[in-house]
Structures are given as C-alpha cells and as structure tokens.
C-alpha cells in the first residue's frame, strides 16, 4: 500500500507495484522566498498532498517536476511521463492573451505561467494525457 505521510486512513489506495504504475509528472506551485523566515530563505516549489493522494488512489505514480525555462528539460519531462498534471494556482496573467487592462500583479505568477505555457505546448506536441485543475 502506497500513501503519503498525510494520507488519511480512509483515503483509497491501489495495491499495485510502483514499477507498474503510470508515471504522472506534476507541475509544482511556486512560493516566493520569505527572508524573515529562516526555513524559506529561497523560493519553494511544492505540490499539495491531496493532489499526490488522488494520483496514488487512481493508480498513478506522482513525481514533482521542477520549474525551469529550459525547453529541452521540459521536453524530456514530457517524453518520460505517461501523463502530466497541472494543479490550480494563481491567475494566468491576462496580458498573455492581449488584455491590457489594469490587473493586480500579485494575483499572478509569471515564473509559473512561463513554465506552464511551455509545458502545455510540449504535452500537446507529444500527444500525452494532460489533467489540469483550476
């Protein structure tokens, strides 16, 4: 039985050898550094345990990607994965589709937008399964 440390006892699990599970790469959330907290002196990349638990319960093997601008790394992520999951997060910057109206930049994450736009392009190129949430 595979689960995360935060899995509750009522979370369904699939008894499958991890080597036989489809590899689902998960795009992380981006959290800026908080210089006043010693444990977050640099930015963090993370995924929610509930997202990991859901992939495990569905029979997948979740693995977190790292955010990068390197298209070759992104392409390799997609090539080795059986599927890609992108969890919800901040708003996508409206400027990406030509909306020039004022918008609160604290509601967006340009680092994540840039990575995820490249990632989705590569997923579509490779015709791999893609699961996203809002």
What spans do the regions from the language model cover?
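N-terminal beta1-alpha1 cap of cysteine-dependent amidohydrolase-like domains
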Residues: 1-133
């Amino acid at each position: 039985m595979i689960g995360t440390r935060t899995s509750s006892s009522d979370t369904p699990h699939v008894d499958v050898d991890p080597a036989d599970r489809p590899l689902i790469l998960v795009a992380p959330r981006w959290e800026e550094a908080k210089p006043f907290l010693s444990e977050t002196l640099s930015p963090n990349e993370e995924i929610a345990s509930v997202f990991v638990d859901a992939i495990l319960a569905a029979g997948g093997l979740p693995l977190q990607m790292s955010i990068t601008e390197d298209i070759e790394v992104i392409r390799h992520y997609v090539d080795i994965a059986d599927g890609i999951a992108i969890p919800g997060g901040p708003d996508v910057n409206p400027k990406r589709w030509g909306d020039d109206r004022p918008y609160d930049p604290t509601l967006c994450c340009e680092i994540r937008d840039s990575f995820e736009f490249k990632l989705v392009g590569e997923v579509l190129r490779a015709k791999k399964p893609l699961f996203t949430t809002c």
